Amino acid sequence: MSERGLLIVFSGPSGVGKGTVRQEIFSTPDHQFEYSVSMTTRPQRLGEIDGVDYFFRTREEFEELIKQGQMLEYAEYVGNYYGTPLTYVNETLDKGIDVFLEIEVQGALQVKQKVPDGVFIFLTPPDLAELKDRLVGRGTDSQEVIAQRIERAKEEIALMREYDYAVVNDEVKLAAERVKHIIETEHFRVERVIGRYHKMINEELPLPLR
């Protein structure tokens, strides 16, 4: 039976560039994990593909899945639900495959309660002025929504202490390399690998004949 995979939880404020950094990580052939597509009730943006960028569902459909206990985590953010389907994550981890979750901060804290041995990585902007420029540059939100996102970002940055690692997204390629290095290092933590060596610890070897 293969070892259970590693759950990698990646989050940060809206507009910090989570999706861009994640795409950079997955653009290289050396990554050894699968991306877990999140589910949301927010409107589908131009160029987004259902089942690739997100699973887009109505509010009624999402709430029914919550009632059925089919979400690993979920959160309501600026009037929309975001969450992670439970079945896919468990099936993938049980196969020994690492799962990469890109989720909101509220959801990440829920996951930490259920899967405390996951790897929790917080992506932060260099400063709030840069974050505001990125939100304005997207051209998808009103000034009122941008102001809400900035205030929410302050609250989320204060929760950074709940994470294992913080990565500054000052340059996409560099941030992606930092995240990959963290994941690689986590695979060598003693508490993750000790199970492989139980047989070695208990094994008795015959002494050489003289």
Swiss-Prot record:
It catalyses: GMP + ATP = GDP + ADP. Essential for recycling GMP and indirectly, cGMP. Coiled coil: none annotated. Its main location: cytoplasm. This is Guanylate kinase. It comes from Streptococcus mutans serotype c (strain ATCC 700610 / UA159). It is found in: Cytoplasm. Pfam families: Guanylate_kin. InterPro entries: GK/Ca_channel_bsu, Guanylate_kin-like_dom, Guanylate_kinase, Guanylate_kinase_CS, P-loop_NTPase. Residues 5-184 form the Guanylate kinase-like domain. ATP binds at residues 12-19. The keyword Flavoprotein does not apply. SUPFAM superfamilies: P-loop containing nucleoside triphosphate hydrolases (SSF52540). GO terms for cellular component: cytosol. Its EC number is 2.7.4.8.
